[in-house]
Each structure stands twice: as structure tokens, then as C-alpha cells.
Amino acid sequence: MRRSSPEKKPEAEWEADAAAAAAATAAATESLPAETEKQQGVDAGAAGDPERLELEEQPKDVGRIPTPTRRHAPEEGEARVVRRLPPALPLAQPRPAARALSQLVKARGRSRSRVYRRSAGSMRPVTVDSSKARTSLDALKISLRQLRWKEFPFGRRLPCDIYWHGVSFRDSDILSGQVNKFPGMTEMVRKVTLSRALRIMQNLFPEEYNFYPRSWILPEEFQLFVSQVQTVKEGDPSWKPTFIVKPDSGCQGDGIYLIKDPCDGRLTGTLHNRPAVVQEYIRKPLLIDKLKFDIRLYVLLKSLDPLEIYIAKDGLSRFCTEPYQEPNPQNLHHVFMHLTNYSLNIHSGKFVHSDSASTGSKRTFSSILCRLSSKGVDIKKVWSDIISLVIKTVIALTPELKVFYQSDIPTGRPGPTCFQILGFDILLMKNLKPMLLEVNANPSMRIEHEYELSPGVFENIPSLVDEEVKVAVIRDTLRLMDPLKKKKEIHFPDIYMDRKHRIPPVSDRMSSWKHKGSSLSIVRSQQMEKSFTSKEDLNCDPTGGDSEPNPEAHLPSICLKQVFPKYAKQFNYLRLVDRMANLFIRFLGIKGTMKLGPTGFRTFIRNCKLSSSSLSMAAVDILYIDITRRWNSVTVDQRDSGMCLQAFVEAFFFLAQRKFKLQPLHEQVASLIDLCEYHLSVLDEKRLLCHRGRPLQRNPPQMNRPEHSATGSSAPRVIGASKLSQS
């Protein structure tokens, strides 16, 4: 018989330990079953370290065999070592408790490798805190049931993976996970702020941003509004415009009205109440069944940096309830004729509730496209223009969103990552050109409507049209944000997910890829309106090998389509203000602030070497004071003193026009950004290399170039429809 090593216990101690362990197991198994298993599963989906949680929640004393102290902690995947009895000991017939002990020991010997596999797979559900979901709760619950995720409707002591807020980022204080709101988004999409952001882009790229009606901000631009309208009328007496007035913070059509004359008495009253935007009314909209309608399109802002944008393939079309007529003094007050807001038309006696997606006062956007297609309309061109509108609008919003984000979640501090579903309200003109009406930070996700049974008595009736669109948007947003989903680095072309283009064997593909590899990206861009595979096809491994069952095999294909960075090459040249925001944030100095102080502005001028004999530092101080004072007088936010981002942009425009003359504004601004980024990169490299004593030699950027893009290369000014409308 081989002698045991010195580390092993004597045989007598083994017998005593085994007997003691069996007795402990017999006593513990009576109280073990349901309560222990329940406790193990309560928080198995907690965010953080799932492996550690699962190991800690196992019963501590049940089935434990006394062993010497471990010399090292087991690594990931290492099995627990269970010492065996010496062969010389006679083995008795195991009793029920001892048999349970042996099974527990064997199971725990394999538990280490199983824990990691189970926690990374479908057994560990994603946890969602829905306690702040509010009106989107019903659609969220349906989505979570379809995804088989775990909901915590009353919150949770431990962190959740995802927090679903109904109003804003600040609905609750969270330090980890993901939240479905960006800080500052509610402020950014208000009528006044959105108009200012789009106006900056219109000054830089007037042709690209002609999808937003001409707007004036009240009360600060009232005199400008009156004078400009008067000037146009004098030049063209036949011009008889109509204007629509929208309160800054209004929603659901509240406070909106139409006017023909800038000196209308109602407009004078608005000037004394609250900020508002007055816009030129679109008089020739596309009509269906003689009714005006708009489109509510859902857009997912998945990430701010890097920028990721998704658009839902279907939306809602909301109809007026009175036949449309061009506005005149007799029908200006007919809100059911001119305003498409659902919250207004629902109170019309002509509102039609329908479970059909193609009839009624609320229909799916896809049904409208089918109807237009039957009349010969180029649907791909319509989608192309809508995609372009959405990307350009988000590009206009992201600079200030970055400032809000660094203020609420400064670099280096704990905080959640953010995503958000936005509601874009778009109107199709008679010539099928899309026009942006507004952007909603909190689009309604209700899947029911109120039905008045009797005066003052309402009943909530499910809306199948709302449920069809909104549940899909929420569910697929969660699928895209799934924190446990494995990120695959191999991206197969979308064409191979089409039912008509099944993935051939690898041997058959290799020869064709050698000849057609260069055209795969072109083929991919032409598959926007493709059909998707069946559940069985989605559950197959495209590499041809065996794989684990797809946890999403029971779900339909994702209804959200990525449009950025997919089309980044076509739109990156528009991101000039985004690059200015990066400069602005760099010189803020104090974490959490949103305004640039005078010292930070001077540091910006010095580090970028913008001062000269014609622009002294005294002139820089005067520039800062004048612009900051003017912007502080018109902005509502007075939390911090200093220069806001929009004031910094105005100062940047002034410096660019002063330094680079005889160029279009966007080229002047791009040249100045290049110069600033060059000097700052040189400064950063000097700080890194100064201790090494290495000389730094870099050539300054070339400023005289024909066209500038955000990546430093030229970009086309006109985007072809075929490049955007297909995937």
C-alpha cells in the first residue's frame, strides 16, 4: 500500500471527520430544501460579479469535508479538489444522509466550471428596474416577458443591469448599469434650444439643413421677426404666409396656435408669458384621404461617444380629423384640421379607433409607405431623405449633450452608461420632402387609449396599432443594450441573413469571396428593405459549426436599423460643432461645470496660439465679456456664471472669420479647428516627451483645401438616395 503524503491526515482523523460530516449533513438536510434554493436564486441576476455572487450564496456548512487550509485560491475553471479516503479503510454501505453528502460533494467538485458557464449564458437573466417607468410600464412588461428577463417593479437593493426611467435621467440616483435617458436631453429638444442648435448648423451648411422651417425665438427676436416678414412682403406682395406659434416647453399640442400677422394680439400676449418659437407654417403637406398627417418615428441614440444611431423600421402616422384646407382667416382656429397631435384629435368626434394598421386616425407608417408605393412613389428615396434628416438632427444635438454628460457624469467618477429613445415628428410635403416638426425626449409609449363610456367616465382600451410598434421598439432597444450579450467580432454581410441568400458552405464561399470581396460592401448597402430569416435560420451558426441554442431564436428580427456609424463617411464632415465642443470641454477646468470661465478662455487662446498683433489678449477679454453677457441675458439656465457652449461657438465663428478670410464659413471654421487641434496635439506630445529630451518635429496643417470633413478628408456635398435607403 502506498503511503500517503505528509499533508494527508491519519486514518483515524479521516474516519472521525467523515462521521462528523455525515452527522452534520443529516441535521442540515431537513431544513435545507426550499429555503436555501430560494435564497440562492433571489439575486442570481445581480449586476456586478455574478460568479462571486453565486459562489457566496451556496450553503456554507452543508456537505463540507474538513480539509487543510488551501495554499492558493482556485483560478477560473479550476475544479474543487476533494480528498478521498485511504484505500485501507473499509467502506460501509452509505446511509441516506451520507449518500446525499457524497452527491453534494461530487456536484460541488464540478460546480466551479459550471458556475462560470451558467452565469455567462441564458441562465443568468438581465435585471431591469421598472419602478420609474410610468406610462411606458405596460409596453416594458410585455417586452421583458418576451425577452425572458427579470423585472424589479419596486426597485432593488442590489444594482440592476438596466434602469428604465419614464421622464429624465435624474428620476433616481444610480451609479452603475445602464439608464434609458441622457442627462440634458429634455432641455436640448425643447423648441428654443433645438431651434438654436439647428440654426448654428444652418449657418454652416444651409443646403444640408433646409429640412427645418424658418424659425424665430420669442421674445428676443420679435422685432427681427416683424422686420423680416415686412421686408419679404414688400418685395413680394403676393406672399401671404401663415405662422405657427409653439411654446418652448409645451407638449401634446398645448398652447399651439396659428397667426397670419406678426402683430397679432395673441402673439403679443405670448411675449409676456413664456419663451416660444414662431415658425413659417407648411401650407402644402401631403394628404391621404384628404387629411393632413404626420409621422412619429422612433430613433435610438445608443451611444454618444462614439456616436451610434438606430432608426425603427416602422412608426406611427397620426391623422387630423377634419379635411385639410390651406389656412385662411376663417379656419385658423380649426385645430382638428391643422394640428396632427394625437392628444388633441382624440377629443374630436370624428376620431376613428381601429385595430387595423392601415385604417383609422392612427396607422402604421409602413401602411402609408405601402399605399404610396402602390401609386408609384419611390419609397427608397423617401427613406433616404428621412434617414438623412435624422442623422443631421442628432449631429446638431450631440455637442451640447456632451457638455451635459460630462457635467452629470464626469470622467473618473462612477456613473451609468446612457441610451435613449427619441420621438421624431416629421411632416411629408406634397413633393414628398420630409420636414422636421420637433423632437420628443419622452415619446409616449402607452399601448392603450381612453374611451369615454359616458360623460366623465373613461375606460382604457388596448390599442393594437400602438402595441405592434411600441413594444417592438422597446424590446429591440433592450436587445441592443443587453449587457450580457456576447460581442461577436466576426460580422457577416447582411445579405447572408436573407431568406433568398442562405449562407453556403465555407468551401463554396471561399472562391467567390476571392473575386467578389471588394463588392460585398456595395451589396450590403442595397439590402435595406430585405426580409429576414425564419427562427430556425436565426438559430443556425453561420460558420457551419455546432453552437449553443440562440436565446433570441423565439424573437422576431430586430426592428431597429443602424444608420450611424454605418453612414459616417457621408456625414462626418458635418460634425464641426462636435469638434468645437471637445475643445470647449477640454478648457472647462472644473469637473461638473457647463460654462467656461475667463481664465479657461484665455488658456484656450494661448494654447491654440490664436493671439497676434491684431488680436491682443485685452481684445480677447473684451470679446469674452461681450458675448458672455449677451448669451446670459437670453438663456434661462443661470446655475453657473461664464460662457456657455453656444456663446463659445459664436466666439469661435468670429475668430475663424477674422483669421481665414475669403472662404465660406464652414471652411473657415474647419480650418481654425484644424489649427487648434494641431497646436494642442503638439502641446500634449511635448508634455509626454519632455522628460526624454527628444526633439519634436511636426509640420503645421495645410489650411487651404477645397473641402473639409471631420476626418480630414473631402466629403461629398450631395448624398445619393441609393446610398442611404438600402442596407
UniProtKB/Swiss-Prot annotation:
Domain TTL positions: 125-477
GO-annotated biological processes: microtubule severing; protein modification process
Positions with a binding annotation for L-glutamate: R318, Y342, S343, K362, K470
Binding site for Mg(2+) 2: E438, N440
Biased composition (Basic and acidic residues): 1-12, 49-63, 72-81
Region: Disordered, residue numbers: 1-88, 530-551, 694-727
GO molecular function: ATP binding; metal ion binding; protein-glutamic acid ligase activity, elongating; protein-glutamic acid ligase activity, initiating; tubulin-glutamic acid ligase activity
GO cellular component: ciliary basal body; cytoplasm; microtubule
Cofactor(s) the record lists: Mg(2+)
Binding site for Mg(2+) 1: D425, E438
Domain description: The flexible c-MTBD (cationic microtubule binding domain) region mediates binding to microtubules. It is positively charged and becomes ordered when bound to microtubules: it interacts with a negatively charged patch on tubulin. The presence of positive charges in the c-MTBD region is essential for proper binding. Gln-252 is the main determinant for regioselectivity, which segregates between initiases and elongases in all tubulin--tyrosine ligase family. A glutamine residue at this position is found in elongases TTLL6, TTLL9, TTLL11, TTLL13, TTLL10 and favors glutamate-chain elongation, whereas an arginine residue is found in initiases TTLL2, TTLL4, TTLL5, TTLL3, TTLL8 and favors initiation.
Protein task: Polyglutamylase which modifies tubulin, generating polyglutamate side chains of variable lengths on the gamma-carboxyl group of specific glutamate residues within the C-terminal tail of tubulin. Preferentially mediates ATP-dependent polyglutamate long side-chain elongation over the initiation step of the polyglutamylation reaction. Preferentially modifies the alpha-tubulin tail over a beta-tail. Required for CCSAP localization to both spindle and cilia microtubules.
Protein name in UniProt: Tubulin polyglutamylase TTLL11
Organism of origin: Mus musculus
